[in-house]
Regions:
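Bacterial N-terminal signal peptides that target proteins for export
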Residues: 1-9
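Structural detector for short beta-strands of small beta-barrel domains
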Residues: 34-50
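Short aromatic-glycine-enriched beta-strand elements
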Residues: 48-58
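Short, structured beta-strand/loop micro-motifs enriched in basic residues and often containing a Trp
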Residues: 72-80
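OB-fold/S1-family single-stranded nucleic acid-binding modules
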Residues: 101-125
Length: 130
């Protein structure tokens, strides 16, 4: 009986780990072979776990505005690199390089953010540092 309990516990642990790894896989959500670059104005910032999100108003070719969601690394990871929530200010004009969502939505994982004054920061998590 004790042996069966250990095996059950081991299998349950392995299954739980698979879900966690799938959630944190950039490859699952974003096409890392298709880089994208957008420019716009930061509309809002959500600085919370497990990943920060910031949203840009992006001017389309037809003159209209569309909202793009940009996923970044975890707040703790970013703060260890000196990037605080004060860096991404609402109203700032930025260009963002990253990878578009696989589902074709106007979401992306942001890697490099370049500000109008030429400063840039790397907002992606460590899994995207390639």
């Amino acid at each position: 009986m004790r042996h069966t309990s250990r095996i059950t516990f081991l299998v349950a642990g392995l299954l739980a780990t698979t879900g966690v790894l799938a959630h944190h896989s950039a490859v699952a959500e974003y096409d890392l072979d298709k880089p994208v670059s957008i420019s716009g104005t930061i509309k809002r910032v959500e600085w919370q776990n497990p990943h920060i999100w910031y949203y840009l108003d992006v001017k389309e070719k037809d003159g209209g505005l569309s909202e793009w969601g940009v996923s970044g690394g975890a707040p703790g990871q970013l703060m260890r690199r000196g990037i605080t929530k004060d860096v991404l200010q609402v109203g700032a004009v930025v260009s963002v390089e990253g990878f578009r969502a696989r589902d074709g939505s106007k979401n992306m994982t942001g890697r490099r953010v370049t500000f109008a004054d030429g400063r840039d920061v790397f907002t992606a998590g460590p899994e995207q540092q390639r």
